[in-house]
Amino acid sequence: MRHRHGYRKLSRTSSHRKALLKNLAIALIMNERIETTVAKAKTLRSYIEKLITKAKKGDFNAHREVFAYLQDKEATKKLMNEIAPKYNERNGGYTRIIRTRTRRGDAAPMAFIELV
């Protein structure tokens, strides 16, 4: 049973899952909208919203924390300087998930995840 289980495994090892979320987060920050499976989008939503909340602080330590998660200078810079300031007055809810289609081949439900 999965009662009170805190996260989705996404059929991956912990290191693979961490790398997947990092790459999806970078793609979302750089493009501001990506298409992925619904399960990945839901997992990414909690990951990216925590990052944006950290980035909203705007100080040097927040910059270092965000970079530690993303390990990408351009994405960190864009998140800190462009994206996070847009959400200063918003308390959470920075992303939107829109279900789109089922993927041919494995019939996985797909969705767009975008920054609001």
UniProtKB/Swiss-Prot annotation:
Q: One of this protein's GO BP terms?
A: translation
Choose one Gene Ontology CC annotation of this protein and give it: cytosolic large ribosomal subunit
What the record says about family reads:
Belongs to the bacterial ribosomal protein bL17 family.
The record's NCBIfam families line, in alphabetical order, gives:
L17
| InterPro entries, sorted | Ribosomal_bL17 (IPR000456), Ribosomal_bL17_CS (IPR047859), Ribosomal_bL17_sf (IPR036373)
- Name the Pfam families on file: Ribosomal_L17 (PF01196)
Q: Which domain of life is it from?
A: Bacteria
Assembly and oligomerization: Part of the 50S ribosomal subunit. Contacts protein L32.
- List the gene name: rplQ
Q: Name one GO molecular function term.
A: structural constituent of ribosome
Keywords, A to Z, come to:
Ribonucleoprotein, Ribosomal protein
Q: What is this protein called?
A: Large ribosomal subunit protein bL17
